Amino acid sequence: MDPSSDYHFLNQILWRRVKLTLVSGIFEGVLQHVDPNKIVVLKNVRNAESGRSVPGVKVFFGHEILNVELMDEAEGASGEKASAVSINTERAGMEKVKNEDVNVCEPASPAPEVPTSSLLSDLKYCPSEEEEVTYTVIDQFQQKFGAAMLHIKKQSVLSVAAEGANVCRHGKLCWLQVATNSRVYLFDIFLLGSRAFNNGLQMILEDKRILKVIHDCRWLSDCLSHQYGIMLNNVFDTQVADVLQFSMETGGFLPNCISTLQESLIRHLKVAPRYLFFLEERQKRIQENPEIWLTRPLPPSLLKILALETTYLLPLRLVLLDEVMSDLTTLVDGYLNTYREGSADRLAGTEPACMELPAELLQLQDFQKQRRERAVKEYRVNARGLLIRTPLHPKEPTACTAGKEERVQGFLFYKTDGGDQVPRFLCPKSHEDEKFLDKESKQTTAKSQIVPPRKEGEAHKDSKNKPGCWESAGPEDPRAQKAHALPPTWASQSQFSLKEEIEQLTVVGNKGALTSPKEGALVSPSLLQETWEAPTDTFHLPEKAEVSTLPPCPALEKTDSWISPSLNLF
């Protein structure tokens, strides 16, 4: 194959289907790229002799090609117009890939070169879809390893990830993924061994001029340090940046937990959960077989997971940087307009050397105060003073499990995996409340008829062993212990229907009993939570509650001594 004559001819038939006759066989595919250095790239490759398709893109070298034939298929012609604009992009992206027998996965429809963040934000993974990420597997030192090192050393920012069997000083590192703006390299450390680090990777990982973007660098840093003597340097950890961003957003509060990569991509990159299926698939595979990354050869589906896992880190870093630096941008904008849009008289009396903190920068105090006030309203605080983050993926509600939603007098109690309750108001209606109370009273009556009377000492023991769907106060809670030790007279009082008691009390109220001056007032969430944790199925309100349009119930007041009198409404 003479480059001087055939190069221009092949460029004229780009995106047409061709047949290449090689020394070792015959291959068919769509001509995607022709390099002056005798490199021909085909996609949708099929071995004409065996009939088997080759996944991704196949690279052929000029000294192997004996003949090139143009195949008359509409497939190539239809793709020519749509992809002609990407010829220069592909040529720049390959960057003279010498001596690389690259077996990679390429986007189905190449597009003009655009900023990496927007290009990567559209990535998605589904086993039934075509590959949408380019990656190169490096499992030998000949040809591919040297070219990869040359490309990586030219970068200023990289994303790095690792997979293996319990990646730490006691585990086994199997794969090291390194992604740039245009390439993703999958280094098979299981096959290459420590020579991979000695021949260039160690220099890159320790280089203080190259920024490495990693999500949770603790495990990889421990593994590299103790097994290979590598001190990881200049790292941007997206997990740490997520906590810093949360602290700034809430005025100084810290979250109760860190975020996984999937949560960070959903929260900051706004990636739809269905496009992050590959992370769920990864977790599923690891649970089924913790040593899945030791498999050789690794299935293409897992190789795609490795590539995608690393590719998303670069745009995630850019978004986190923008969010963390948002206050700086706002304050600088105010600084720019301080004198420019002010009166000229103000400048005459201003000393240039005045070092007093200007009002434009004092706004930062107001920002933090407002954020703290908003955070206290939006989040709940745990015992350590940390804000409890709302799960991004609540599990499907099941009976007697976390994630169950229950409506209680106009409130929606959402129970998280951690056992916390978040009350949310749902605009109560009187007829809905009446139906709810009627339903609860029927359940109470049915239970009281079936359950035989028990001794006083057995109440706490049985309630401890009885499974329940909602949270209990626990044996350490003195309120729960006292509630379980109620006298036996309570059982006889609970025999009455709650609806009948309310109707009787309504009649008494119409004759002169006091009613609440605040009709339609809302019940305090803390009060409802205390009432919800009662061991019985009947709701009670303390005497100070000014929320019900019904008069107080004398029969219920006698047994409300266990409710803390300090509970007040708004």
Swiss-Prot record:
Keyword list, A-Z: Cytoplasm, Meiosis, RNA-binding, RNA-mediated gene silencing
Name assigned to this protein: piRNA biogenesis protein EXD1
Summary of the function given for this chain in its UniProt record: RNA-binding component of the PET complex, a multiprotein complex required for the processing of piRNAs during spermatogenesis. The piRNA metabolic process mediates the repression of transposable elements during meiosis by forming complexes composed of piRNAs and Piwi proteins and governs the methylation and subsequent repression of transposable elements, preventing their mobilization, which is essential for the germline integrity. The PET complex is required during the secondary piRNAs metabolic process for the PIWIL2 slicing-triggered loading of PIWIL4 piRNAs.
Gene Ontology CC annotations of this record: P granule; PET complex
Location of this chain's protein in the cell: Cytoplasm
The UniProt record lists the keyword RNA-binding: yes
Name of the gene encoding the protein in the UniProt record: Exd1
Annotated stretches, region: Disordered: 433-485
Free-text domain note: The 3'-5' exonuclease domain lacks the conserved Asp-Glu-Asp-Asp (DEDD) residues that coordinates divalent ions essential for exonuclease activity.
Composition bias, Basic and acidic residues: 433-442, 453-465
GO biological process: meiotic cell cycle; piRNA processing; regulatory ncRNA-mediated gene silencing
Organism: Mus musculus (Mouse)
